[in-house]
């Protein structure tokens, strides 16, 4: 399992569009084979910056998603809302404390 973090910097006037669109596709993404968890975070100081945080079973699942028809529908539209190019990281969890 690994974690995928994607930073999305949106045009300020497109934040509402992003949130509405995400609401329509979030369940499809979350239930894509291999996706185990999905959250979206919003920066407290810059309200047009979001982070998606997802757990994937393995890298082949994420690659399959990125080549899927679903991603092909989501990503081109989402990119039209960007102020800056998206940044993405695939990371392994090192420590969890509760």
Residue ranges and their predicted role:
Residues 2-9, 39-66:
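Short, well-ordered beta-strand segments in beta-rich or mixed alpha/beta enzyme
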Residues 4, 34-36, 84:
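A generic structural signal for short beta-strands and their flanking turns/coil linkers
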Residues 8-10, 22, 81:
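Short linear/disordered segments characteristic of secreted peptide precursors
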Residues 10-12, 58, 92-95:
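Non-catalytic surface loops within mature trypsin-like serine protease
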Residues 14-37, 70-75:
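Short amphipathic alpha-helical segments
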Residues 30-33, 57, 83:
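Short conserved AdoMet
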Residues 39-46, 76-98:
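Glycine-rich beta-strand-turn "strand-cap" elements at beta-sheet edges
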